[in-house]
Curated annotation (Swiss-Prot):
It catalyses: a sn-glycero-3-phosphodiester + H2O = an alcohol + sn-glycerol 3-phosphate + H(+). Its EC number is 3.1.4.46. The active site is at 6 (proton acceptor), 48 (proton donor). The gene is yhdW. This is Putative glycerophosphodiester phosphodiesterase YhdW. Ca(2+) binds at residues 33, 35, 107.
Amino acid sequence: MYIIAHRGASGYAPENTIAAFDLAVKMNADMIELDVQLTKDRQIVVIHDDRVDRTTNGSGFVKDFTLEELQKLDAGSWYGPAFQGERIPTLEAVLKRYHKKIGLLIELKGHPSQVGIEEEVGQLLGQFSFSINNIVQSFQFRSVQRFRELYPSIPTAVITRPNFGMLSRNQMKAFRSFANYVNIKHTRLNRLMIGSINKNGLNIFAWTVNNQKTAAKLQAMGVDGIVTDYPDFIIKDGKHENI
């Protein structure tokens, strides 16, 4: 089972920053989940929201900034003074820093401004084909499908919305044609659904789990990965995965 650090160890450090990613590595996470978008000058940056307002000292849409402009913003002070000066990283910088240390679960954001992001991310990942483990995912099923068509050797995942119900056999068959994993909100999962998904040839990630008892229950039910803000408190193989 994969322990997947949600935007890094974001329970302890500002999300989607090198500080959060370094901490995830120290906490022995198996993967880092992160979000990518394209800048005005078509550079791939790691940030969740379509605007910079919540997680930086700037204001405006990511798509309206060049990379140089974005990297002048402070992406850490909003979380705490200890993280002042953290910057929005590029996906390339993240791959260079971590490709031999930890896997990446890369979410393609589905904003209208992100046309062509599948090609951009796939080309970059091709330069790091010797990485430990990379998986590309999205809430936008067409984006995952497009990525699979372009880069069939790179594993993919579909993320389902919180209100997504029980997957039908036809839905699972459709997903299986372009994805290896289904990433489902943990409150929607039960033993019956997990068994059904596995029987239909898909692996399962559960997002976002920040309760130890819930994590243990999901592990016992057979999920293949747990996405969490606190990768150090997940119990794996009978042991805490601590620093």
